[in-house]
Amino acid sequence: MLVTILALCSGTVFMSCSDKENTDSPQIPEQPTMPKITEDFEDFATWVAAAVQRCHPYISQFWNADAEQGNFNLLLTNEGKNKLYLINAEGKREIPQSEWDDALNRGLSEVESAGYYFLTFQNRYCCLQIHSMESWEAMKQIQQMQKGTTPALEEWGYYMLHTLYHESFHNYVQDLKSWTKSGSSTDREQSYPVNYEPRIYRKLAFLALRKAWEEPAKASEQYVRAKYWIQKYETQYVEEAGSIKETDIVEGTAEYFGRNVIHAAFPDYELLYGTEDYNLSGLIDDESYQLSVAVQLIRRDGRLDEAMKAFKNMKATPIDFLLKDVAAPKNYDESQDATDVAKIRAAMDKQFSESNPYMAPVIALVKRHNSGQAVYLVVNNSNQVVYTSTQGYYSLTDYPGFTCLVNLQASYSRVECMGITVLSWKDYTLFSLADESHLELTDLQDIQEERSPFPNVKFNKKATLTAVNNEESFKMKELPVQVKYGTDELGNKYYVCQ
């Protein structure tokens, strides 16, 4: 699961449903009055606790018995990580440090990487989160970049609620109830350079379903439109459609669940992704979240119980289940979608350009590699990962097996990196250096040429690495270390830690 600041999209008024899943909904108790929210940790924790008490009663309304209230517990700590509250349906309880165990202390040391951490604490499944003003500032910057507006502090609170319900759904409904191991999905990588056509087809299907939600009287018409585009996608891009299926199910259902639980308690919270440019320019797995609208429509159509069985058995994605009885049109006039296609293309042109601060380092790294001027310090991280989080994966079409990780924050046993873009190859992470002068090497020796783990790279030297200079974006934890050295057919240089 990718860890990104929650997309804050245009609001949609929640439509009450008359389907059978609603008829047996529990009576929701009177909602507590919300306290004032401020940046102060105590005030913020009090607000979150009241919000959780508002949201929890809706858990069973939007999913079946697999979603147990007792498995949705929040551990909230402050920026100094010296205060901790357990928050759930029972209220808010401070946990004194005398009760902190090894699992919790490990979580506290790692929570800043992804913003959350799962653990079992005092026989409860818990989601640990940190009230970090640095993360709040990052969220504000992203929204200002996307929408040009400053989000209210409540939206930071909503983000924490969304993390609690969405991510706990992965861990304590999907994984715990033997769905699929959601954390092991390997199909989320966006190919680079980006082929616009499959992205456009899926986004057109999303736009059709959004219109079906907004205008129920025209739902049948929009279902046909969505069926055409999703079938064209699945026919022309068979391999990609098969590989993204699991993520469509896993993220689509978790997004549906998390947004509904919060929106039911807070109607100003956006139920669905909007259709703004930044939502039309995302990567392949962004679409998996957006297509959660299909689960909303399944529920509105009264078929959620049946769909749950299909999702659990990984038989159908939300959009395929929704449209399984819809006939694809034989003669569809694609020109009617020309305006939407142009809008999507323009949004993607902006997204995948050097003007995007998250895309610029990817473009620069690939250009440097293509030129043969790259210098990599390479670390094997197999069985050494402490934590990792990234804001995007790009599989490099021109270099099969290589993946570009955007804004990676990671801790390995041998290296720590702080928000940089790197390459990965199997269990190896490749840190790009400005030049070789950053490496202090001793005992440089020629060796008999030998094969390396990397394609078209042969080792011909070895040395002892004693220091890495002027690199603020990552640091080596273990020095000195032995390295072997080689080049690829383009001239790029690889210093591989042994």
Give names to the regions the model predicted.
Residues 1-2:
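Bacterial N-terminal signal peptides that target proteins for export
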Residues 7-35:
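Bacterial Sec-dependent N-terminal signal peptides
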Residues 28-101, 158:
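N-terminal mature-domain "stem" immediately C-terminal to a signal peptide or N-terminal signal-anchor/transmembrane
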Residues 43, 47, 310-498:
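Non-catalytic terminal regions of proteins
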Residues 120, 175-240, 244-270:
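Post-HExxH zinc-binding segment in Zn-dependent metallohydrolases
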Residues 162-175:
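Active-site recognition of the HExxH zinc-binding catalytic motif
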Residues 238-334:
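Active-site-proximal alpha-helical
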